[in-house]
Structures are given as structure tokens and as C-alpha cells.
């Protein structure tokens, strides 16, 4: 959650974390689903992609390389789906560089 907040990304819902049936109605509002652990949520993400055309990212953001790849995938979908809404494209390369520079 902190990493997404650092990138200026608002989280729609975290399911199943304390989720309720009432929160399920908000799922189609998301631009992309993040499935950090394939064991939990992948089938839901596949269903939402099939039913609502909502893409998902299933890379686990663990370690420098996979976290950078995860951020690049998020950047790709934001720039594909949202530039008309935001009025600009995002570039997270400087964030990735800053976070991995001294590792």
C-alpha cells in the first residue's frame, strides 16, 4: 500500500482483506487489478478480465527486479488507460532508480 501511495495511486479495494459483499460492487471501478500473490486472487482477476475487460498484473513485487517490473506494468496500464482522464502520462523510472540506487 505504501509503494502505491508513493506513486500517487489510489487503491479502490483490497479483497479479501476485511472485505464484505457490499465492497464487491466497487471492483469494476478499478483500472487494473493487482494480484501480488497468485495463490490468492488470481481466479478473481481472470474473471474480472473476462467479464469487464479489466486487465490484471500478477507479478509478485518481491525483490528489486520483480518490484521494478511490477511498477513498469502498472505504469504501462495507467498510460494505456488513463492519459485522457489524467491529462498526462506517468513515468515511474526515477522512483525505481531512487529506490534501488543503493542496494
From Swiss-Prot:
It is an enzyme of class 1 (oxidoreductase). It catalyses: chlorophyllide a + oxidized 2[4Fe-4S]-[ferredoxin] + 2 ADP + 2 phosphate = protochlorophyllide a + reduced 2[4Fe-4S]-[ferredoxin] + 2 ATP + 2 H2O. GO terms for cellular component: chloroplast. GO terms for biological process: light-independent chlorophyll biosynthetic process; photosynthesis. One of its GO terms (molecular function) is ATP binding. It is found in: Plastid, Chloroplast. Binds 1 [4Fe-4S] cluster per heterodimer. The cluster is bound at the heterodimer interface by residues from both subunits. Pfam families: Oxidored_nitro (PF00148). Its cofactor is [4Fe-4S] cluster. Its EC number is 1.3.7.7. Pathway: Porphyrin-containing compound metabolism; chlorophyll biosynthesis (light-independent). It comes from the Eukaryota. Keywords: 4Fe-4S, ATP-binding, Chlorophyll biosynthesis, Chloroplast, Iron, Iron-sulfur, Metal-binding, Nucleotide-binding, Oxidoreductase, Photosynthesis, Plastid. InterPro entries: ChlB/BchB/BchZ (IPR050152), Nase/OxRdtase_comp1 (IPR000510). Transmembrane segments: none annotated. Protochlorophyllide reductase is composed of three subunits; ChlL, ChlN and ChlB. Forms a heterotetramer of two ChlB and two ChlN subunits. Belongs to the ChlB/BchB/BchZ family. Component of the dark-operative protochlorophyllide reductase (DPOR) that uses Mg-ATP and reduced ferredoxin to reduce ring D of protochlorophyllide (Pchlide) to form chlorophyllide a (Chlide). This reaction is light-independent. The NB-protein (ChlN-ChlB) is the catalytic component of the complex. PANTHER family: LIGHT-INDEPENDENT PROTOCHLOROPHYLLIDE REDUCTASE SUBUNIT B. This is Light-independent protochlorophyllide reductase subunit B. The gene is chlB.
Amino acid at each position: 500500500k505504501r509503494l502505491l501511495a508513493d506513486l500517487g495511486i489510489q487503491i479502490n479495494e483490497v479483497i479479501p482483506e476485511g472485505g464484505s459483499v457490499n465492497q464487491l460492487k466497487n471492483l469494476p471501478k478499478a483500472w487494473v487489478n493487482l494480484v501480488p500473490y497468485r495463490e490468492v486472487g488470481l481466479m478473481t482477476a481472470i474473471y474480472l478480465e473476462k467479464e469487464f475487460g479489466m486487465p490484471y498484473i500478477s507479478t509478485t513485487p518481491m525483490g528489486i527486479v520483480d518490484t521494478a517490473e511490477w511498477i513498469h506494468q502498472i505504469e504501462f496500464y495507467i498510460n494505456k488507460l488513463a492519459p485522457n482522464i489524467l491529462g498526462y502520462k506517468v513515468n515511474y523510472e526515477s522512483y525505481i532508480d531512487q529506490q534501488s540506487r543503493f542496494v
